[in-house]
Amino acid sequence: MNKKQKNKIAIKHQFPTGILVLDNKTVFKGVGLGYQGSATGEVCFNTSLTGYQEIISDPSYAGQIINFTFPHIGNVGTNNEDLESDKIWTRGAIFNSEITSPSNYRALKTLDEWLKKNKIVGLTGLDTRSLTNFIRDKGAPKGTISNNKNGIFNIKKLINNSIKWPGLN
C-alpha cells in the first residue's frame, strides 16, 4: 500500500449514493462504495468478526449479497493471500459503518479499491442489525443493491429486478 492510499479519508455524502431494494418493496438507503452499478441476489448475513475478504471470495456465497453485522470492516485491507478462491462469488456487500482505512502491513489495496476491481457493489451506512433481524424473522429475501454517485435510482426497476430474479437453485 502506498503513502497516498494510507492518507485517504472517507468523504461524507449529503445524500444516499447507494441503495438496497428487497422483493417485498422495502428500501434501505446508504452510501455506495466499490463498483458503481447494480447487482441482484439473495440477501444473507454474516456475523464473523474477521475474514471479510475470505467471505466475499467464498464459493458458498455464490449469488448472495452479504450483510456484514460487525461494525468495523476494512482495517486489514486486502491482499492476494486471503482469498478463498480465484473468483469472487458474492454479488454485493453491505456494511454498517464507513470502511476503516487499512493498517496491516500485508495490505495491497483498500477494501473499496478491491471491490471496484472485482466489480462488487458495496453499501455502507445501513442499520445492519435491523436487516439481520428481518432476514432472521422472514427468511433470506431477494434484493438488488445499487451504487450510483449521483444518488439517482429507479426504485421501481430495482424492485422488479428483485422480484424477477429466479433465486438460488
Predicted regions and their residues:
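RNA-binding accessory domains that recognize and position tRNA/RNA substrates
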Residues: 2-169
